[in-house]
């Protein structure tokens, strides 16, 4: 699963997800992609599940690019522990996804294959998504 090799600080504050995605809102590698319509934390497990769903359907044809990376540590205190006594340990890693962010890109396959592969991938993600096609695409 994806996670940073090393970070400057072990823990982060939760932060707020307001506004639209400032970067990563255009297709850069592939011809087809899925764009986020909501804001949410997408965990490393969800990204991996979506990747597996898409690659299984594509049967090793074409290429898939994951355009989000889980670089935010999400902490959790153990069960039945009273409040206070510091912040909990890092439980998992998540990527902050805002509306407009391209999450996955696919290239080298026909449109119907890409559409179905990305639909299967989108079912594994906690955000509403939209299928997008590159401007210079010709069938």
Curated annotation (Swiss-Prot):
What are its GO cellular component terms?
cytosolic large ribosomal subunit
Keywords assigned = Ribonucleoprotein, Ribosomal protein, RNA-binding, rRNA-binding, tRNA-binding
Q: Which Gene3D superfamilies match?
A: Ribosomal protein L10e/L16
Q: Which Pfam families match?
A: Ribosomal_L16
The record, for InterPro entries, names: Ribosomal_uL16 (IPR047873), Ribosomal_uL16_bact-type (IPR000114), Ribosomal_uL16_CS (IPR020798), Ribosomal_uL16_dom (IPR016180), Ribosomal_uL16_sf (IPR036920)
Q: Which cysteines are joined by disulfide bonds?
A: none
State the source organism's domain of life: Bacteria
Q: Which PANTHER family match?
A: 50S/60S RIBOSOMAL PROTEIN L16, LARGE RIBOSOMAL SUBUNIT PROTEIN UL16M
Q: Into which family does the record put it?
A: Belongs to the universal ribosomal protein uL16 family.
Q: What is this protein called?
A: Large ribosomal subunit protein uL16
Organism of this sequence: Christiangramia forsetii (strain DSM 17595 / CGMCC 1.15422 / KT0803) (Gramella forsetii)
| Gene name as annotated | rplP
């Amino acid at each position: 699963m994806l996670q940073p090799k090393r970070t400057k600080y072990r823990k982060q504050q939760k932060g707020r997800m307001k506004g639209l995605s400032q970067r990563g809102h255009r297709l850069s590698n592939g011809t087809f992609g899925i764009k986020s319509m909501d804001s949410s934390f997408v965990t490393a497990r969800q990204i991996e599940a979506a990747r597996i769903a898409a690659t299984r359907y594509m049967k090793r044809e074409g290429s898939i690019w994951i355009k989000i990376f889980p670089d935010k540590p999400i902490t959790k205190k153990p069960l039945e522990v009273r409040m206070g006594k510091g912040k909990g340990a890092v439980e998992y890693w998540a990527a902050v996804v805002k509306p407009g962010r391209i999450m996955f890109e696919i290239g080298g396959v026909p449109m119907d294959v890409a559409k179905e592969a990305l639909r299967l991938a989108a079912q594994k993600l906690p955000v509403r998504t939209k299928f997008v096609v590159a401007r210079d695409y010709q069938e």
